Regions:
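Reductase modules of NAD(P)H-dependent flavoproteins
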Residues: 2-73, 84-105, 276, 298, ...
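Fe-S ferredoxin-like electron-transfer domains
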Residues: 21-27, 31, 97-159, 179
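Residue-level marker of beta-strand positions
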Residues: 55, 79, 121, 168, ...
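Cysteine-centered iron-sulfur cluster-binding motifs in ferredoxin-type domains/subunits
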Residues: 69-78, 111-115
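Ferredoxin-reductase
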Residues: 137-265, 346, 374-376
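Short Gly/Ser/Thr- and charged-rich N-terminal loops/segments
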Residues: 289, 293
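Intrinsic disorder
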Residues: 297-300, 304
Length: 452
């Protein structure tokens, strides 16, 4: 038997063993994997009959019950929390870090980590049952800053969505292969094209090999109609060590997809989600009233006994803060509650919705807009735009909180980059502000950590 024949026989034997092992694994899986249908009881009320084998979050989505998920069901955001009071097995190591010991005892789980193998009884927030999925039409998708788009889509005709300002939406991201060179340059805008060309943005390429989901805060408030409006920052790859260009890794999947869309395109959105809402308060002696419980139940007048409010934002974190502020002013006409908005940006041309907030200052004596730019900006000086040079947490302290009589009594609402949020929390902690007075937009990453 010659050498070539030996090689061929070895390959045939090897492939035969591999095929036998694969067949064995499939047989074992078929025997061990439960078949048929089971029942999922939601909140001791709604009963679903579903097939086995998939994750709880995916199974519920097939039944039009949408648990939130900022990571596409990969177990990294911790947003798809629910109580699994019967069935579901024991909590997995991948879930433990998202819950306190008390929550684990109360059967809290991540929907993306629970396999549907048996009858389940689960408890979810009632608001989850009001979430709907829509096929929306892109209305506009223009750049409002160098790397940030205002992405606006219209709900289908006849559809209406009740939501509380500060909520977020989810967008389905399909498989794709996108070249940034194909982006519509008119939608980016002449003002921002030089920076895109300088950083060779149009050389980037992004591939998404499996459908996923991402979450974004809504910048719109209810009076603006049946739309989703998001502010989305493009997530570029990191720079090479020598700063000669971007590293050869995928840009952000969701932001690449959104930046590629044009008016008229169809997208799948769901919402509303989230609990980043203006706090409820007692405003009368007769009992509790609300200024944020539902879009239709908010009071048109609020009295001066309510605490002062401060919003702190940066970058695309503008979205939910704009929604809350515009709703309180333009819709509810709140004039007897002190309100301040501190917004940080690198330069004036990175600040969007500026004219809206400057006009609010004129129309509402109780509203004050504070702009913080990283460094002195000649463009802002030339245009006469009022700002303070420095990072937003320092500007907030030096120009206002340092001399405030009771900063611990203020309500703080925050959304922005992680380092900004951490710096603000650390500063407020040093001023004696209790954690319950600091609200932040969060997709499962946990509260911003104080620095040591």
């Amino acid at each position: 038997m010659d050498f070539t024949t030996n090689i061929l026989l070895s390959i045939i034997v090897f492939l035969g063993i591999v095929l036998l092992l694969v067949a064995l694994l499939l047989w074992v899986r078929n025997k061990l994997m439960p078949k048929g249908e089971v029942k999922i009881t939601i909140n001791d009320d709604k009963v679903l009959t579903v097939p086995t084998g998939n994750t709880l979050i995916a199974t519920l989505a097939e039944q039009k019950v949408y648990l939130p998920s900022a990571c596409g069901g990969k177990g990294s955001c911790g947003q798809c929390k629910c109580r699994v009071v019967e069935g579901g097995g024991t909590i997995l190591p991948t879930e433990v870090g998202f819950f306190t010991r008390k929550q684990i005892q109360d059967h809290w789980r991540l929907g993306c980590q629970v396999k549907v193998k048996e009858n389940l009884k689960i408890v979810v927030p009632q608001s989850i049952l009001n979430v709907k999925e829509y096929e929306c039409t892109v209305v506009s998708n223009r750049n409002v800053a160098t790397f940030i788009k205002e992405f606006k889509v219209q709900l289908p005709a006849g559809e209406h969505m009740d939501f509380v300002p500060g909520s977020y939406a989810q967008i389905k991201i399909p498989k794709f292969d996108i070249n940034y060179a194909d982006f519509d340059k008119e939608l980016i805008g002449e003002e921002y094209l030089p920076s895109w060309e300088k950083f060779k943005m149009f050389d980037l390429h992004c591939v998404n090999t499996e459908p996923t989901i991402r979450a974004y805060s809504m910048a719109n408030y209810p009076a603006e109609g049946d739309v989703f409006m998001l502010t989305v920052r493009i997530a570029t790859p990191p720079f090479k060590p020598d700063r000669s260009g971007f590293m050869n890794v995928n840009p952000g999947i969701a932001s690449s997809y959104i930046f590629s869309l044009k008016p008229g395109d169809k997208v799948i959105m769901s919402g509303p989600y989230g609990e980043f809402h203006v706090k409820e308060h007692d405003t009368t002696e007769g009992g509790p009233s609300t200024n944020s419980g539902t879009a239709n139940s908010q009071l048109s007048t609020l009295n001066s006994k309510l605490p002062e409010m401060i919003w702190v934002g940066g970058g695309a974190g503008m979205a939910p803060l704009r929604a809350q502020i515009m709703h309180l002013t333009r819709t509810l006409n709140v004039r007897d509650r002190e309100m301040h908005y501190f917004y940080g940006a690198r330069a004036l041309n990175e600040v969007f919705y500026l004219q809206d907030f400057l006009q609010l200052e004129k129309d509402f004596p109780n509203f004050h807009f504070h702009l913080a730019l990283d460094r002195p900006d000649p463009a802002a000086d030339t245009q006469g735009v009022k700002y303070t040079a420095g990072f937003v947490h320092n500007v907030m302290y030096d120009t206002y909180l340092k001399d405030h009589k009771a900063p611990e009594d203020i309500e703080y609402y925050m959304c922005g980059p992680g380092p900004m949020s951490a710096a603000v929390v650390n500063m407020l902690d040093n001023l004696g502000v209790a954690p319950e007075n600091i609200l932040y937009d969060d997709f499962g990453g946990g509260a911003p950590k104080k620095s040591n």
